Structure formats: C-alpha cells, structure tokens
C-alpha cells in the first residue's frame, strides 16, 4: 500500500476521508439536528462532479478509504453516479457509505454494483414509537426492510451504529446488539457528540460512557476484547457464540485522537481537519476558481495538514463549542 503524502505536524498519516455529499435528510434525529432545520442553498453545495474530483485528489495523495455520508446521502439525486466514479479509482480499496437506511430497499443492489464495499446503517431502537420519537420523521419498518435488502445485496460488510442515550434507548442496547449479531452484522455503540445547539434533551444528563454500557452488555454477552480495527475509531469486543462483534466509539471517555487518520469534507466544501474543532479550509473556492483542475486541490490538501490539531476538546458540561450540526459535519 502506498504511503500517504498527507502527514500532519504530529506525524499522523491521513488515509481516510469522509465526504458529506448533502446536509439534507429525510429524518430529524434529535441528537443530529433541529426539527426546523435550515439547509444550505443548493448553489453552496458541491456538485457530484466536484466531489468526484476531490476523491481523485485524495486518492492521488495516498488516501485509500472514502466514506460517503450526509445528511442522508441516498436522497441526493443521481448519487449513484458519484459512487461509480469513486468506485472506479483503483487505489481506493475501501469505499463505504453511512446511511439511515430509508432508501436501501431500492438502492442497495445499485450501490454494490457501483463498487461500494461496506455500509453503516444508523439504528437506535427497535421500538416503532421510540423510533418516531428519536427520528421525528422516520419509519422503522422501512429501515428494517432496507437492512434486509442490504444483507441480500452482496456488500462485504454491513455494520449498525447506535447512539445511546440513558433515558431514551439504553434499555434496548442488548436487544439492538442481538438483532445485529444474529444477522452477522457488527454494531457500534456511540457516545453522543456535542455538535450544534439542541433543545430536545440535555446531553450531560443523557450521557452514558462506553465502559458503563459495556459492563451492562456483559450481563447479556460474554465479551472479549480484540485488536481489530476497520480504519475508524471503534474499539471492538468479540461476543461469544457470534461471528460478529460489538464496538464502542468513545469520543468523551476514550478519545481516539492519537491515531486519527481522517479528515472530512462538508457538503459546502469545507475541509474539516478535526471533528471537534473548527480548523478548516475552503475547498469550494479552489474548486470553482480552477474548475476541473486537480493540482490546486492537491496543493491545498497538503498545506492543510499543518493546521490539523492534536486533539478535540469535547466537554459535556459546557455549551457546545462546535455550533455546526452533525448533518453539516457528516455523520
């Protein structure tokens, strides 16, 4: 595997980029965005061609993993064309998608055909009423049918992501894990990240650490720590009698900054060097000043490594320092 040209001032190589191709979503999950969310003007969102060019630029600089996220990426018109463009880049050996699952019934097979290797599906509850409460607009049965379609479509791997909140869905953690493991899917439980101002709940009240959750799950599963990583921040535990694993993403209790290998591009073309900092570079301005040219983009990406911070500064007890919502950042 080629070494990345993208090396920050702390010696970390960036080999993974997350592209948020839209800030729009057909859900309004309470931890992700406001119910009356104002979205970007469409002219401010990068075109699919601009995202494809960014993918090529990152690949030429040694990135080997691209994850497409949103908002909900699959509601973007003609997004399959972007996956086809990214899937055609030989040096990208891991093309992934994060989705809420609402469009997978019709798009799972086209995604596999376009070259997508792995997908993560967000699923925080198996209770229909609670699903409506958490997502505001979502339909649980549609998502479950989408997951079934994905399981039959031929992806190399399907993983579930669950954000756990103490008074919303903590009591379902074991059921969610069982649902995933019995179907051969890994599941990652995520500590809620303090991005954007929300009014539906208090993050510090709802917080449960990964260690607390793992101890609770140990009542239902015999868990053994593994050294397995998939290029992301999950720490995985093997559940006895299952081939799949349970992971924990712990930005508060066990941050993953020292091994950070990723950057993000927002729907509006901001290169975010850190999930929990506002350090960024305006790639849209460069893309539109030099349409179709890859070298100015590569130069900007290399130069941006100098401002990638050592770590994030998440603090549940303070007002959020990052005012952009998760749908703007790329979940």
UniProtKB/Swiss-Prot annotation:
Pathway: Cofactor biosynthesis; molybdopterin biosynthesis. Its cofactor is [4Fe-4S] cluster. The lineage of its organism: Bacteria, Pseudomonadati, Pseudomonadota, Gammaproteobacteria, Cellvibrionales. The keyword 4Fe-4S applies. GO terms for molecular function: 4 iron, 4 sulfur cluster binding; cyclic pyranopterin monophosphate synthase activity; GTP 3',8'-cyclase activity; GTP binding; metal ion binding; S-adenosyl-L-methionine binding. Catalyzes the cyclization of GTP to (8S)-3',8-cyclo-7,8-dihydroguanosine 5'-triphosphate. This is GTP 3',8-cyclase. Belongs to the radical SAM superfamily. MoaA family. [4Fe-4S] cluster 2 binds at residues 257, 260, 274. Residues 9-233 form the Radical SAM core domain. GTP binds at residues 18, 67, 98, 159, 262-264. It holds the Pfam family Mob_synth_C. It comes from Saccharophagus degradans (strain 2-40 / ATCC 43961 / DSM 17024).
